C-alpha cells in the first residue's frame, strides 16, 4: 500500500474513532458510563477527567453510580456533573453519587437523532476532505512526471474505494445509534 493511501486510511480511521466517541457520549435510553467521559473535575486545582477520579458503573438500566476513589472530592465531582449539559442531578450519600437518568421523551429522542446525523455529516465531510487531499497529491505527482495519467486514474479509484468504505462505516454507526435512541 502506498504512503499516500496509508496516510489517508490512518486519517479516516481517526475520523471514525472521533465519531465513535462522540456517539458514545450521546445518551440513548439506557445508562452508559461513557456519558460522563467528557466531564472534567477540578481536582486540587487541575482539570481532571472524571473517569480518572472515580469508578463509574451502570447497575440498573437508567442509573449510573459514581464512586470516587478520594471521597473528599465528592463535592467537586457533584458540581462538575451539575455544570455539565447532561441535565442530571446527582444524589450523594457521602460515599457515592447516584445519577438517575430520566426517560427520554419522543421530542428529545428526535433531537438526539438530529444531533447524531449532524455528527455523522461532520465525519463524512472530514473523510471527503481527506479524499480531496489524497487526490490533489496524486494529481501533483502526475504533473511532476512521477506517475502516468493511467496510474493517476488507478490511484484515484483506490482512494475512492477507501472513501466509500469509510462512508459506509459511518452510515452503519449512525444507523445503530439511531436504533438505540429510538428504542423504548
From Swiss-Prot:
Protein name: Ribosome-recycling factor
HAMAP family, per the entry: RRF (MF_00040)
Gene Ontology biological-process entries: translational termination
Signal peptide: none
Underlying gene: frr
Family the UniProt entry places it in: Belongs to the RRF family.
Lineage of the organism: Bacteria, Bacillati, Bacillota, Clostridia, Thermoanaerobacterales
PANTHER family, A to Z: MITOCHONDRIAL RIBOSOME RECYCLING FACTOR PSEUDO 1, RIBOSOME RECYCLING FACTOR
Principal location: cytoplasm
InterPro entries, per database record: Ribosome_recyc_fac, Ribosome_recyc_fac_dom, RRF_sf
GO terms for cellular component: cytoplasm
GO molecular-function term, one example from the UniProt record: ribosomal large subunit binding
Subcellular location, record wording: Cytoplasm
Described function: Responsible for the release of ribosomes from messenger RNA at the termination of protein biosynthesis. May increase the efficiency of translation by recycling ribosomes from one round of translation to another.
One Pfam assignment: RRF
Keywords, ordered alphabetically: Cytoplasm, Protein biosynthesis
Origin species: Caldanaerobacter subterraneus subsp. tengcongensis (strain DSM 15242 / JCM 11007 / NBRC 100824 / MB4) (Thermoanaerobacter tengcongensis)
Amino acid at each position: 500500500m502506498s504512503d499516500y493511501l496509508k496516510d489517508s486510511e490512518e486519517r479516516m480511521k481517526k475520523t471514525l474513532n472521533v465519531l465513535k466517541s462522540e456517539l458514545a457520549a450521546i445518551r440513548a435510553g439506557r445508562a452508559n458510563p461513557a456519558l460522563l467521559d467528557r466531564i472534567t473535575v477540578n481536582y486540587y486545582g487541575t482539570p481532571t477527567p472524571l473517569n480518572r477520579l472515580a469508578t463509574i458503573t451502570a447497575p440498573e438500566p437508567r442509573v449510573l453510580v459514581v464512586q470516587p476513589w478520594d471521597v473528599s472530592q465528592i463535592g467537586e465531582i457533584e458540581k462538575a456533573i451539575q455544570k455539565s449539559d447532561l441535565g442530571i442531578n446527582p444524589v450523594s450519600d457521602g460515599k457515592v453519587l447516584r445519577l438517575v437518568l430520566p426517560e427520554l421523551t419522543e421530542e428529545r429522542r428526535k433531537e438526539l437523532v438530529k444531533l447524531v446525523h449532524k455528527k455523522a455529516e461532520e465525519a463524512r465531510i472530514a473523510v471527503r476532505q481527506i479524499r480531496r487531499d489524497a487526490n490533489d497529491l496524486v494529481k501533483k505527482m502526475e504533473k511532476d512526471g512521477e506517475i502516468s495519467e493511467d496510474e493517476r486514474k488507478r490511484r484515484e479509484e483506490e482512494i475512492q474505494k477507501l472513501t466509500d468504505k469509510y462512508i459506509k462505516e459511518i452510515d452503519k454507526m449512525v444507523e445503530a445509534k439511531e436504533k438505540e435512541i429510538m428504542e423504548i
